[in-house]
């Protein structure tokens, strides 16, 4: 609770577990919902769907679900990730973004919405020289007209490295270019 209070005191929007964050972005109400799917026996689907329904009832026009899921170093999402991602979209999430595996797991378009399974590490201080420095930035534009949200299919995926140095982690994420960018996105 101390961390939440510190973030609140600093005016930093935070969310997760039992807290949905709302932000006004150019007059559009955006809901940010956090979930955690790593503890054995922890079924978060019902809580996540309830949070999505709460966000909708509170007038959120865009609902982004961030979930901490997956098995470390696995480059392919597990069936539990796919099922939960699909459930989030089916419940009304506009976008699902995952983290935890420490590697890129790619993304899919499901029922007209994107699920990004894992972005990789991006800015990671847990290892001075991780063997996999690949990560990506996922950008998507939404057009809101009244209560209708249209996603722009012209997404932008930017391949990156968590470091500008190949021999160590200097904590300076850097966009990749050329063959390196192609390799990361392959």
Question: Whereabouts are the PLM-identified features?
Answer:
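Acidic, metal/ion-coordinating pockets
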Residues: 3-186
């Amino acid at each position: 609770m101390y961390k939440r209070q510190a973030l609140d005191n600093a005016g930093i929007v935070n969310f997760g577990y039992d807290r949905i964050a709302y932000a006004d972005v150019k007059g559009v109400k955006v809901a940010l919902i956090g979930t955690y799917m790593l503890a054995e026996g922890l079924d978060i689907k019902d809580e996540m769907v309830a949070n999505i329904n709460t966000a909708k009832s509170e007038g959120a026009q865009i609902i982004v679900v961030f979930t901490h899921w997956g098995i470390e170093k696995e480059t392919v999402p597990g069936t539990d990730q796919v099922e939960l991602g699909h459930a989030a979209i089916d419940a009304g999430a506009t976008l699902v973004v995952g983290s935890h595996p420490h590697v890129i797991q790619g993304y899919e378009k499901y029922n007209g919405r994107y699920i990004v399974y894992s972005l990789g590490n991006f800015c990671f201080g847990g290892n001075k020289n991780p063997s996999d420095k690949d990560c990506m930035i996922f950008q998507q534009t939404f057009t809101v007209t009244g209560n209708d949200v249209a996603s722009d299919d012209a997404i932008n995926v930017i391949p990156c490295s968590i470091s500008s140095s190949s021999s160590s982690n200097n904590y300076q994420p850097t966009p990749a270019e050329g063959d390196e960018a192609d390799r990361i996105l392959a």
